[in-house]
Amino acid sequence: MLATWKLLVDRDCGSKNKAGVDAVGQDVKGILESAGFKVRFYEYPEAGNLLIAERGDTTKPFVALIGHLDTVFADGEAAKRPFTIKDGVVTGPGCLDMKGGVTVLLSAMRILNEAGWDRYPVKVILAGDEEAGHQKSTAVRDMMAEAKGALFGLNFETSFKDNSVVIERKGVATFRFDVQGIGAHVGNNPKGGRSAITEIAAKVADINALTDYDEGTTLNVGVIGGGTVPNACAEKAFCVVDVRYKGEAGITRVRAGLKAIADKVYLDGTHTEVTELFYFPAMPRLESSLEL
């Protein structure tokens, strides 16, 4: 088990390193094949491949075991911080998120195979671009299709230090506001410009006001920018908004609210577009999850 953990941690496999992620996928493929699985991949040109491994007849209700192979770390991190055990604690890039979880999954499958356990068919689903939000692949669609027909799913992503089990998770969405103003020299033509920065600054307060803690919905304007030089009225400005929400009612309200904010004009002569860059659905708490 430790040897497998070390093997996975000591490979550079950040989301941008497709070759590294795919190499980890091949490592995992070999281990799962030795545990009786048939392995195949969804191949993506610009993202780590999606690994699918099956044991038993998965046309019948099966158990889905889910996770990812990539990390957030840049190339070279594995050499700088290799797999290390000190005072009973493992360190190294991705040792927690989620090479440890993948190692537990692989070890469990090996042990169950050796014990002859075959009560249910099993399907392993391991993404290669989770940390990048699957933005350059069709992995979300492909994983949902592969998970269809499962009795239940277990995600091997790391939980919290108290070893609790996560049975619900907020959804995430990202939006970008782009404001078009009118550029002008602030010395020669101080009244001629329409500052995109002024417009977007007014909108930031409106965006933040959409937060509803009781509903479980929060918004954060985490990135903002605009203009080029201090002596010119900013012709363009932008901001990027992170949204966390518990249910579809929350994200539906936020979408409508952000569109209304974009359409509202504080400074005549400016125009704003809002674009939804990313959306990941929430995992609601279900009675069936509590029973499981």
Predicted ranges, named:
Residues A64, K123-I125, E273:
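A structural signal for isolated positions on well-ordered beta-strands in alpha/beta enzyme cores
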Residues F62-A64, V90, L151-N155, R176:
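Short glycine-aspartate micro-motif
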Residues M98-K170, D212:
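Acidic/histidine-rich catalytic neighborhood of metal-dependent amide-processing enzymes
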Residues E43, L126, E276-F278:
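Residue-level recognition of beta-strand->loop/alpha-helix junctions
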Residues L7, L106-E114, A202-N208:
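Short glycine/serine- and small hydrophobic-enriched flexible loop segments
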Residues M1-P93, I111-W117:
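Acidic/His- and Gly-rich active-site-bordering loop/insert found
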Residues A3, C13-G14, A23, D27, ...:
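Metal-dependent amide/peptide-bond hydrolase catalytic core
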Residues V89-T103, H185:
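Glycine/serine-rich anion-binding loops at beta->alpha junctions
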